[in-house]
């Protein structure tokens, strides 16, 4: 008997970690529904397992609600097996500084929290019934910057990710009654376009003495959504090359 493929909804899919995660799940024969502000690369749109991409700005409440509605219409009555909250934002001030406690207006801070913290919560609520049908898994993408002062992240980004780490534990407790597991992955210095040009100076502070690759994160996300992790919930996995232990 051939089983129907499992389905994952993944945000922030147009580049970097999100793009690699889409490819990873597709190669495992999952159906993938994605969301990002930008259209995905052409090679991704040609993937037969990439069932649908919805352009949406999750920072905007109405756009997020429309995404949930459209994605649920695509699911119909089928279960959802995984939700990967990957979308995130670390903006700069007009003077090209990351948003700190003393610089940047509070409206910019609010926008960071809207995407990095509130969007994962809203999406988890929106897809809760579908995830329950699939005994699903939610994976929130946090950051090493949520656990220690980081020279390039900025206070707004770091505190939003710290809040998401805490939210993951609370969600794990509450979603357990639905049979849904909730975990997070905290990347360290991953070689993507989001990296600061000065990140190379941090390599000596990484015990493995190198940058991570997007696939390092994608494979960890997949593990947390697979049958190999059915007794894991409320956990944050650091994929940092050991940077977080120093």
Located regions from the model:
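Conserved glycine-rich cofactor-binding loop
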Residues: 14-15
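Active-site helix of classical SDR
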Residues: 124, 160, 168
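Alpha-helical segment proximal to the catalytic Tyr-Lys
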Residues: 129, 173-177, 230
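Short, small/polar-rich loop/turn modules that mediate ligand/substrate recognition or access, typified
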Residues: 135, 176, 181, 232-234, ...
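Residue(s) in the substrate-gating loop at a strand-loop-helix junction
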Residues: 143
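Short C-terminal tail/terminal secondary-structure segment
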Residues: 148, 201, 222, 233-246
